């Protein structure tokens, strides 16, 4: 698998096999590039632009009313998608490597509508969103859904915590 954690301004791409990271690439781009693209077209506040990004996403291209905004977001995130594809291509070309079979997306901005589909179309592999909390038991004092809003951003802390167990 290739695990892609889309951060605000940094994205981590990690090729993993049997739970072992084999190849890591850090890209100086993230979901904020889509917000920046919206800001260049609108005088709205950053908070409103973040909401628009997560409501409209990349799928608005087919709606004439929103096509310019979605197209701008797609163009802003395209270099990141190309980096994912080139990282997988590079790794697959290494002698003795097993081919990457899928992409796992993490990070709040991985939930931008249309982003998983755009990645899947460009890398020609199945893509799925995964919560780092999936399969982990939560304490009895933790309300169900307490972490839902930011669970996709917890990959690094959860990984570090599990690594120390």
Where in the sequence are the language-model features?
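Hydrophobic/aromatic-enriched cytosolic interaction surfaces used to assemble or bind macromolecules
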Residues: 1-165
């Amino acid at each position: 698998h290739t695990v892609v954690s889309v951060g605000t301004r940094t994205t981590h791409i990690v090729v993993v096999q049997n739970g072992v990271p084999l190849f890591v690439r850090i890209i100086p781009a993230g979901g904020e590039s889509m917000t920046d693209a919206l800001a260049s077209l609108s005088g709205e506040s950053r908070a409103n632009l973040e909401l628009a990004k997560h409501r409209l996403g990349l799928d608005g291209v087919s709606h004439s009313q929103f096509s310019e905004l979605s197209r701008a977001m797609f163009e802003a995130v395209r270099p990141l998608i190309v980096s994912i594809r080139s990282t997988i291509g590079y790794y697959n070309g290494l002698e003795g490597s097993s081919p990457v079979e899928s992409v796992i997306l993490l990070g709040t901005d991985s939930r931008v509508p249309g982003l998983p589909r755009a990645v899947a179309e460009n890398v020609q592999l199945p893509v799925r969103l995964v919560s780092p909390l999936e399969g982990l038991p939560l304490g009895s004092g933790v309300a169900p859904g307490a972490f839902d809003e930011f669970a996709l951003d917890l990959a690094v802390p959860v990984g570090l915590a599990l690594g120390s167990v």
